[in-house]
Amino acid sequence: EMAIVNANYMSAALASEFRTYYSGETGRVGHEMILDLTHFKKDYNIDCGDIAHRLMDYGFHAPTLSFPVHETLMVEPTESEPKAEMDRFIATLIQIKRECEEAAASGEADNVVVNAPHTAAEICGEWSHPYTREKAAFPLEFIRESKFFPYVSKIDNGYGDRNLVCRCTE
């Protein structure tokens, strides 16, 4: 029951920013909410995968991506999810949407969302992006308290899908 309460809390908090798929007649969702990002490619030239990668800069593992609907995020808060953590996730999604809007308004293809995730080596190394290191690594104040840096930067998902290497041990 608490998973349903948590999913509906998050869905209501994000309702002004994101459309939710599969809500009932009362506007409520089940134990999960599916956020519609289908228009992001057209509106911001940013896709669902870019947003999933940017979530890593905020310290979150991406939720289920493009299932059951292409270009969506399926968020399933657990029964024991603390409200403070849900609030951080909500603030993160809203901030990432703002970053998408800024990128579209500036017309800048080299932006903080499409280049995510940003590793510690990248933040500390030579910087060639038009946005600041601060924006890349610490976009919201709560991140300063316990920053987690991803170990790898953006990878070519399509290449990985087409060139699977299976290694079996004996």
Question: Residue locations for each model-derived region?
Answer:
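Non-catalytic terminal extensions of PLP-dependent enzymes
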Residues: 1-170
